[in-house]
Amino acid sequence: MRVGTTLYKVVNQPCASGGYEKRRVIWNNSTLRQDYGKNYLATVPKYDGFCTVPDHLNYRKEIDGFLNLYEPIEHTPQIGDFPNIRSLVLHIFGEQYNLGLDYLQLLFLQPLQKLPILLLVSEERNTGKSTFLNFLKAVFGDNVTFNTNEDFRSQFNSDWAGKLLIVVDEVLLNRREDSERLKNLSTTFNYKVEAKGKDRTEIAFFAKFVLCSNNEYLPVIIDAGETRYWVRKINPLQNDDTNFLQKLKEEIPAFLFFLTQRELSTEKESRMWFNPKLTHTAALQKIIRSNRNRLEIEMAELFLDIMSNM
């Protein structure tokens, strides 16, 4: 394909897991002629530029001459049951089960809607946090990216800035600048994309964040009064089914059909949809309290240093 004045070849790059990741590799005219003949260039699809427009039900690859970088999902909603997905959502969201369904429904039907930063914490093992992240990846495909803590600190962000979901399996962003950047990203509507060797460009930013951590006290800095986080303490799973993820994948079409028919249990009450009172949890309060205690200790140490030098 040609986008603007640049040729790209779409390739399927093998992954360690056995699957493939679709990538666009910059190509050139001479190589194209060598591989396919001099007349092939005239048949190459041509676009004026890139755009990023999320839509899961009425997806369009080309929009007014622009190539949509948002990827279509693989699943078509169809009637069926989803007992394993239901059990996973209930396990993750517990007494906030209906809010959890609302969250997933908004992701699917209203991908531009801002949503809280979902933070799943537990010091225990085998809690299903990673399984939930892999389930989201299975539903939304290439529109989900797994980031590391360092990715948030890098100036280059072109590989994740246009995604629906940015997930981190072991988050530890306990520096003030990390926390401020994460909060700003969760509410901004536009963002500067930067890639190596290319000029910065501004795009619409609609990504949501799902973070997991084994640290229940200070995975990120959250101040008192902060309303952008939804923190859930996750308990261990009662059983360990090695085929659970595959069972989840098989139920995705039925679950998506359910989401298209379900009526939301909440109405939009904030920029992140939910009334902050609904997503305030004891797990969130624990992090806020731990952060306050840490600040008090740092201030006390600072005062002691000052007094010792007087």
Roles of regions detected by a PLM:
Residues 1-95, 217:
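N-terminal nucleic-acid engagement/recognition segments and initiation subdomains in replication
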Residues 56-167, 171, 179, 230-232, ...:
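P-loop NTPase catalytic core of nucleic-acid-dependent motor ATPases
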Residues 121, 267-310:
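DNA transaction DNA-binding modules
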Residues 156-161, 194-212:
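AAA+/SF3 P-loop NTPase mechanochemical coupling elements
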Residues 170-172, 189, 215-216:
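Conserved Walker B
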Residues 172-173, 183:
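Catalytic acidic motif of RecA-like/P-loop NTPases
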Residues 179-201:
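Conserved catalytic/switch belt of AAA+ P-loop NTPases
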Residues 219-239:
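A short helix-turn-beta junction within AAA+ P-loop NTPase domains corresponding to the substrate/partner-engaging
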